[in-house]
């Protein structure tokens, strides 16, 4: 089975559409969404509707911190993020908010764990940024691979049978073999607001038959997404950063 994995879409309809089209062209069998469907971007209704439609057809979706902030507040967010959440609250319908509120923090199937931020304390929204923070998740997990997002930068960590943790930066389009002798923690980057210096949307395909993970980079219409952000009256920085991938 080929599983398409998407995280941090952030109300970017153009990026999500491009990634879904790319995934279909690569003949995926299953879709998994790892949170942060709203915030920053100008198309929250489209993105939530799209994710909800996929869930109704059997896809998995978990909740991210921006989705959570729609109901719980923005005390821990930057000013621009908080402004985007406040605007988003006025865009979503009651049923869309109910959908987001009802999503789980994590989900699992077979030997895979799906979560937005981390494995060891998913409700705390701590970031995985280095070997130490990755090791906490790798120790806490029992699955062969955990897949998450949250930091908007693609990364891959693994733990050996002796407990040694290592990492490397994945290259887009290159199949990565997932040795059964290791535990794996894959950080998927972002569909809707990449921050690794590459403006192309990022998602991944997990092939459980071949036991490979492939990060994908997909160009999309940034001009359209940025124009909508400005037209909505959201902070201009949220539009500008799409071009820089930062």
Q: PLM features: residue spans?
A:
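Core catalytic region of metal-dependent phosphoesterases/phosphodiesterases
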Residues: 2-6, 11-99
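Active-site environment of divalent metal-dependent phosphoester hydrolases
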Residues: 10-15, 39-41, 66-71, 108, ...
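Charged helix-capping and loop-helix junction motifs
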Residues: 45-47, 128-135, 168-169
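Short, conserved loop/helix-junction motifs that constitute active-site signature segments
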Residues: 53-56, 139, 178-180, 206
């Amino acid at each position: 089975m080929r599983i398409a994995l998407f995280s941090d879409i952030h109300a970017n309809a153009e990026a999500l559409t491009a990634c879904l089209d790319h995934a279909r062209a690569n003949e995926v069998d299953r879709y998994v969404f790892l949170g942060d469907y709203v915030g920053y971007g100008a198309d929250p209704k489209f993105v939530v509707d799209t994710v909800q439609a996929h869930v109704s057809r059997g896809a998995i979706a978990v909740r991210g911190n921006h989705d959570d902030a729609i109901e719980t507040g923005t005390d821990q967010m930057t000013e621009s993020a908080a402004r985007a959440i406040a605007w988003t609250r006025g865009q979503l319908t009651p049923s869309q908010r109910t959908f987001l509120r009802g999503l789980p923090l994590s989900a699992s199937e077979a030997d895979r764990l799906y979560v937005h931020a981390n494995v060891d304390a998913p409700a705390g929204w701590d970031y995985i940024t280095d070997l130490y923070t990755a090791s906490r998740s790798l120790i806490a997990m029992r699955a062969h691979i955990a897949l998450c997002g949250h930091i908007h930068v693609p990364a891959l960590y693994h733990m050996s049978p002796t407990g040694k943790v290592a990492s490397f930066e994945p290259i887009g389009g290159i199949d990565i073999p997932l040795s059964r002798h290791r535990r794996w923690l894959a950080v998927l980057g972002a569909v809707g607001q990449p921050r690794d210096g590459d403006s192309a949307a990022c998602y991944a395909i997990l092939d459980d038959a071949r036991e490979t993970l492939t990060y994908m980079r997909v160009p999309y219409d940034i001009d359209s997404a940025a124009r909508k952000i400005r037209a909505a009256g959201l902070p201009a920085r949220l539009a500008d950063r799409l071009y820089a991938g930062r």
